[in-house]
A protein has these predicted regions:
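N-terminal, active-site-proximal structural segment of metallo-dependent hydrolase catalytic domains
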Residues: 1-57, 64-72, 227
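Structural recognition of the beta-strand scaffold that forms the well-ordered cores
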Residues: 34, 118-121, 150-151
């Protein structure tokens, strides 16, 4: 799920959205939740760590980190330095790792290792060249993983799945969104920017893109089993 980042409310965000997001996530009753552009406690969120607040309200664990590399100038900027990505998971889930791309502004990769599979959460660059360098790094991480892999997040693919076709083939990944339905913007979706991708060994049993407008991106909901 892509957390809201409204331009007009960047300095002081809409405090009413967080309870609505929590209510929506609770209605799905998920085992794992990925959050993109989560605020970890800036003035925009009124010093509330959104990942911790949602996880606490749902009785889940959370792992989060800023989406910028340690040497990025963004680490020095108010508000921006508190923007990150997060996993929320049931208490039995553990074993997170943080990786960083070598290029782009948004560099964070969160890896969540389960007993039978691994999940990578990403937010790729807006720049085409940087995205494809990031995909190369992501491919290397996937190849180092001995378990079936799920990759999810905001890929910023303005050409949709066609832009990552070769990456999918090379990594043995399939999109859960078989109809290539658009996910952005939520008010009138036209672009497929967000993906849940999975390898052989994972069986998707259900997939949905609920039309809720708590964010500028629509959320992706996927049920799966380990084959």
């Amino acid at each position: 799920m892509h957390m809201p980042l409204p331009g007009a409310g960047y300095v002081l965000g809409n405090k009413d959205v967080l309870p609505e997001i929590t209510k929506f996530v609770k209605s799905i009753d998920p085992d794992i939740v990925g959050l993109i552009e989560v605020d970890t406690g800036s003035i925009r969120s009124r010093m509330v760590n959104q990942a911790e607040r949602i996880a606490s309200d749902l009785g889940m664990n959370t792992s989060y980190e800023t989406k910028y590399g340690s040497k990025s100038i963004n680490q020095m900027l108010p508000i921006v330095r508190k923007q990150g990505n997060a996993f929320m998971a049931a208490p039995r889930v553990h074993g997170e790792k943080f990786h960083y791309f070598d290029t782009g502004v948004k560099r964070l990769i969160i890896e969540l290792e389960m007993d039978e599979f691994a999940v990578f959460l990403v937010h790729l660059s807006l720049k085409y060249r940087h995205r494809h360098l990031q995909l190369r790094k992501l491919y290397d991480l996937i190849m180092e993983t001995s378990k079936p892999v799920i990759v999810a997040g905001d890929f910023n693919t303005f050409w949709g799945e066609n832009e990552i076709y070769l990456f999918l083939r090379a990594a043995g990944l399939t999109s859960a969104n078989v109809e290539s339905l658009p996910t952005y913007p939520s008010r009138a979706p036209r672009k497929e920017l967000d993906f849940i991708l999975y390898q052989e060994g994972i069986e998707v049993t259900a997939f949905d893109i609920p039309h809720v407008k708590h964010s500028d991106h629509l959320p992706l909901v996927c049920d799966f089993e380990v084959a």
